[in-house]
């Protein structure tokens, strides 16, 4: 995350995942993030609360900003849109409840609390008329109200068989459901009518779709559904070089999206599989939230020289999380820990407490794509290019 100082030299800049670890306190801080979700509600006849989800390279933070409709800042907030980058300045932070439920709360009455847009409007990209700033992960689309228009980039996982659908006029129409994924979640696209079904005949599990103005709904079972009735759709084959360059998507990145859509799992899904079959393995995007490096440094337990201390190195990470839950005390492979910390266990023996704290700052609150194994009531974490049984 970029560091901005200039006239705000006395303000602290926090990456989002560090903000999410702060307790209830009062201090000055500021950060920059991209708006990926935006709602508002009337609190009283004269007060409105804007509810944001802001994203940077380290994660997502939620923010509630309350202000009077007579405030000079009110008109600026009305003009904010998805994709705009904003600065947030505040001297107040408040934890509501739980690691996944709390939000930053600021009010325009706090003179040191404000939101400023860094650009007047989101970047607009020609052909098809929107940019990567406006592409929303499916995990965030779940927070949108039913009927919201969204832009998504998804890979097809599978297509269901054709059905016959009877509409309100009892006219029989062809219907097909297509399941799609991105690296954060899943959804389904329901095609109704001959023209929609025909348009998707060439789609298969190699197809990636860039969809502009899909309409998001929740089904009775809670599944996310995307209506493409009024959408603009580009398939992988129709991306030309100019659009790819403007959207900042390389061929390699498209391949990663496709691979992630098929293979990326969640901690919750693996836990459910393990509860039924006794074991489960998959690739998961996780965030390292807590380590034992502070405690082990004080105990002198970072010295590496025998099996016991080697095991303690494997126990270095206390908590990992993804969007579905958390895991305590996972066993990390030595190879993966060396990749993450960029230090060998033998080098840990010469670190003092201050150096150990600095090392912790290198890997905490960072996203990693790792392999996770649930086996014999233990959770193992390892890199994708090493066999699990090499260290269990």
Curated annotation (Swiss-Prot):
Keywords (A to Z) from UniProt: Cytoplasm, Meiosis, Nucleus
One Gene Ontology cellular component: cytosol
Principal location listed in the UniProt entry: cytoplasm
GO MF terms, alphabetically ordered: single-stranded DNA 3'-5' DNA exonuclease activity
Biological process (GO), any one: reciprocal meiotic recombination
Localisation per UniProt entry: Cytoplasm; Nucleus
Function: Has a role in meiosis.
UniProt name for this protein: Meiotically up-regulated gene 11 protein
């Amino acid at each position: 995350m970029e560091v901005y100082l200039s006239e705000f030299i006395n303000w602290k800049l926090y990456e989002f995942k560090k903000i999410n670890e702060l307790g209830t306190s009062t201090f000055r801080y500021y950060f920059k993030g991209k708006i990926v979700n935006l709602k508002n509600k009337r609190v009283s006849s004269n007060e409105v609360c804007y509810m944001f989800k802001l994203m940077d390279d380290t994660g997502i933070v939620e923010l509630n900003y309350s202000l009077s409709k007579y405030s000079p800042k009110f008109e600026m907030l009305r003009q904010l849109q998805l994709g705009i980058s904003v600065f947030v300045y505040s001297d107040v932070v408040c934890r509501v409840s739980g690691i996944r439920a709390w939000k930053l709360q600021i009010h325009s009455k706090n003179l040191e609390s404000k939101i400023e847009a860094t650009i007047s409007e989101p970047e607009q990209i020609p052909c098809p008329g929107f940019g990567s700033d406006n592409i929303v992960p499916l995990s965030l689309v779940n927070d949108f109200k039913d009927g919201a228009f969204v832009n998504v980039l998804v890979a097809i996982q599978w297509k269901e068989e054709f059905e016959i659908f009877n509409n309100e006029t009892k006219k029989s129409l062809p219907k097909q459901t297509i399941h799609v994924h991105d690296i954060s979640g899943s959804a389904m696209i329901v095609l109704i009518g001959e023209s929609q079904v025909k348009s998707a005949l060439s789609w298969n599990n190699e197809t990636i779709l860039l969809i502009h103005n899909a309409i998001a709904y929740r089904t009775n079972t809670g599944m996310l559904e995307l209506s493409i009735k009024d959408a603009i759709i580009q398939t992988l084959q129709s991306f030309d070089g100019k659009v790819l360059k403007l959207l900042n998507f390389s061929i390699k990145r498209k391949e990663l999206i496709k691979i992630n859509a098929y293979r990326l799992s969640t901690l919750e899904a693996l836990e459910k599989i393990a509860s039924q079959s006794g074991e489960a393995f998959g690739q998961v995007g996780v965030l390292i939230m807590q380590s034992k490096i502070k405690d082990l440094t004080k105990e002198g337990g970072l010295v590496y020289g025998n099996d016991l201390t080697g095991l303690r190195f494997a126990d270095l990470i206390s908590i990992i999380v993804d969007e579905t839950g958390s895991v305590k005390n996972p066993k990390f492979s030595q190879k993966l820990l060396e990749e993450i910390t960029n230090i060998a266990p033998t080098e840990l023996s010469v670190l003092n407490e201050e150096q150990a704290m600095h090392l912790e700052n290198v890997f905490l609150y960072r996203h990693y794509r790792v392999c996770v194994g649930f086996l014999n009531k233990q959770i193992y974490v390892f890199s994708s290019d090493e066999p699990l049984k090499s260290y269990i």
